[in-house]
Amino acid sequence: VLSSTDKSNVKAAWDKVGGHVGEYGAEALERMFLSFPTTKTYFPHFDLAHGSSQVKAHGKKVGDALTNAVGHIDDLPGALSALSDLHAYKLRVDPVNFKLLSHCLLVTLASHLPSDFTPAVHASLDKFLASVSTVLTSKYR
């Protein structure tokens, strides 16, 4: 459960991301594909090369979904219901992949926002991404 401090930390950190949301989303995807090659199996139709327009476009989708989640931090199930359906019923993404992407997002944010990425902010973002992952995998049960 996200505390009021966690919510404030997440919102403040996401404000710092600002217009870089697509760029950071794409970078996190690239990190995931390089660090966890099995995740590539969900993107057989993508050009996964560095700087690929398809990875950039999907990174923007990921970033925009997280921006939506931050904006609806008190109702993540409502905000992410359609995405949960998509990933559970159509794409059938293995739930572990959300944890892998979350880790890569944390690394990406830490590398771009080092002075803002305090231990407290890190913990809050980790809890937030875990909450998002839980919602996205809730329809699997």
Swiss-Prot record:
Residues recorded as bearing Phosphothreonine in the entry: T108, T134, T137
GO CC terms, sorted: blood microparticle; haptoglobin-hemoglobin complex; hemoglobin complex
Residue(s) carrying N6-succinyllysine: K7, K11, K16, K40
GO molecular function: haptoglobin binding; heme binding; iron ion binding; organic acid binding; oxygen binding; oxygen carrier activity; peroxidase activity
Record-given protein name: Hemoglobin subunit alpha
Binding site for O2: H58
A biological process from GO: hydrogen peroxide catabolic process
Domain Globin, residue spans: 1-141
Ribosomal protein listed as a keyword: no
Modified positions (Phosphotyrosine) in chain numbering: Y24
Self-association and partners: Heterotetramer of two alpha chains and two beta chains.
Keyword Transmembrane set for record: no
